Structures are given as structure tokens and as C-alpha cells.
Amino acid sequence: MSRRRGPRRRGPRRRPRPGAPAVPRPGAPAVPRPGALPTADSQMVPAYDSGTAVESAPAASSLLRRWLLVPQADDSDDADYAGNDDAEWANSPPSEGGGKAPEAPHAAPAAACPPPPPRKERGPQRPLPPHLALRLRTTTEYLARLSLRRRRPPASPPADAPRGKVCFSPRVQVRHLVAWETAARLARRGSWARERADRDRFRRRVAAAEAVIGPCLEPEARARARARARAHEDGGPAEEEEAAAAARGSSAAAGPGRRAV
């Protein structure tokens, strides 16, 4: 069974901190702060008569006394006031500022601004370390040579110079590729080099086999083989001895390097 909760109690309202700006309530008339600049919403008009300023304005709000004008019921017509405007300004006594325009209330006096600090004279510069000085010098020389090379017109070849087989465009850039020595050698030789090595190896093996099998394929070796086969079929010991003697004689005639089969 769920517990029933009563109405939520609200705690005490937080009081604004001292010195925090007051937030105006919605719908309340906006009151300009002392020293604030006039805005488009306030529609302030300069007061030509200091006596018509708002008397209820605080003493610290000099902006309201200077700019705010409250119209009265017994004001004369605008046309009459406009006609006497030049005469009133001509007969009006000079202001306290000596004819100068009044300074804005928000503008700070010139005496209040602190003078700019005097510039410190730079002393003699410290010498650079050797490696930095060398690098600076080489960089300066390189930039000077580069600028001189850019200013100099490109050298054109003479007319009687022999023309090469290949003419590169000035836009072509040649970049040297770095390759391993083995890869470069194989690229120069190609696949035919390996095929030639294989053919040489096969030729040597065939020659070695012919040196061993060649004596067995000669006519004399074949005749001895036939005689030995007949003697074996007949079974006579005399014929076997003759075949063995003939084989020994043929091996002696062939030489020590050859072997009779």
C-alpha cells in the first residue's frame, strides 16, 4: 500500500545578497540608474530650462536633471517658441564652460587618466649563441641567393648548341628514387638472368649423367652384354670364363677412369 503524501511545503524565500543588482518586476516602469547612458526606450529630450526638470529626482542623478523634461500645461505654442529660439540663444549669457560643449557625465576627466609609463631604453643586445649565430648567417645568405636567383632572368641555351635527344619541359621535376642494391640489380638483370642460370645448372647435370651412362651405351658394351646373357642361358662355365676375360680386357682398354658394366 503506497503512502499518501500531503501538500509540498515550500521553504522561506531566499533574500537577495547585499550588493546584488535588483531584478525589476514584470510590468514595472524602468527607472534609469544614476550615470547610465540614454537609450532608445527612454526617449529622453534635453532640457532647455533647468527649472522644468524633475524635482523628485535624486540629487545624485545629474543625468535626469540634464536630459529629462516634463511638459507643463501652460507651455506656449511651438511656433512662437521656434520664432524666439534664435533671440533667446543670442541674449543668453555664456555658460560656465566658456562656450565649450559640456562634457558627458560618463566621460572621465583628463586629469584622472594616469600618464602612460615612459618607455625604457633598450640596452645593448646580448650576443647570440654560436650555433644560433651560424644558423642565422647561413639562412640570411641562402635567402639572399634565392632572391638574387629569382630576380635573374632564366638562362637560355645558345642557338648553335647541339640539341639533345630528350627535351624536358621546365615544369617537369626529376626526383631521384632511393632503392636497395639487390632490388636495383635484379631490376637491371631481369627474369632472363635467373632462367640462364637454371639452364647452365641443368646442362652441368646432364653432362655428369652422360659421363656415367655413356660407356654402357657403346657398341662394345652392348656386345659384351649379349654374350653374357647367352652364357647365362646355356649354363656353360667355359663361356662364362671367356665372357669375364673379355670384360676384363675391355675395361683395361677403356682406361682407369671408366668402369665396365
Swiss-Prot record:
Q: List the InterPro entries.
A: PPP1R15 (IPR051254)
Where is region (Required for nucleolar localization) located?
Answer: 1-19
GO-annotated biological processes: response to endoplasmic reticulum stress; symbiont-mediated suppression of host autophagy; symbiont-mediated suppression of host innate immune response; symbiont-mediated suppression of host translation initiation; symbiont-mediated suppression of host type I interferon-mediated signaling pathway
Could you tell me where the Basic residues compositional bias lies? 1-17
Q: Is Repeat a UniProt keyword of this protein?
A: yes
Sequence motif: Nuclear export signal, positions: 128-137
Q: Where is this region: Disordered?
A: 1-59, 75-135, 145-164, 223-261
User: Which residue ranges have biased composition labelled Acidic residues?
Assistant: 75-88
Where are stretches of biased composition, namely Pro residues? 18-32
The ranges of region (2 X 5 AA tandem repeats of R-R-R-G-P) come to: 3-12
For whether the record's keyword set contains Glycosyltransferase, the answer is no
Task: List the residue ranges of the region (Interaction with host EIF2S1/EIF-2ALPHA).
Answer: 206-221
Task: Provide the protein's localization.
Answer: Host cytoplasm; Host nucleus, Host nucleolus; Virion
Q: Which residues cross the membrane?
A: none
Could you give one GO CC term from the UniProt record?
Answer: virion component
Compositional bias (Low complexity) spans?
Answer: 101-111, 244-261
Which family is this protein grouped under?
Belongs to the PPP1R15 family.
Q: What does this protein do?
A: Plays essential roles in viral nuclear egress to mediate capsid transit across the nuclear membrane and also in the inhibition of host immune response and integrated stress response (ISR). Facilitates nuclear egress cooperatively with host C1QBP and protein kinase C/PKC to induce lamin A/C phosphorylation and subsequent reorganization. In turn, lamina disassembles and nuclear egress occurs.
Assembly notes: Interacts with host PPP1CA to form a high-molecular-weight complex that dephosphorylates EIF2S1/eIF-2alpha. Interacts with host EIF2S1/eIF-2alpha; this interaction is crucial for the specific dephosphorylation of EIF2S1/eIF-2alpha by PPP1CA.
Quote the record's miscellaneous comment: ICP34.5 is detected as early as 3 hpi prior to viral replication but reaches maximal levels late in infection. ICP34.5 gene is therefore classified as gamma-1 or leaky late gene.
Name of protein: Neurovirulence factor ICP34.5
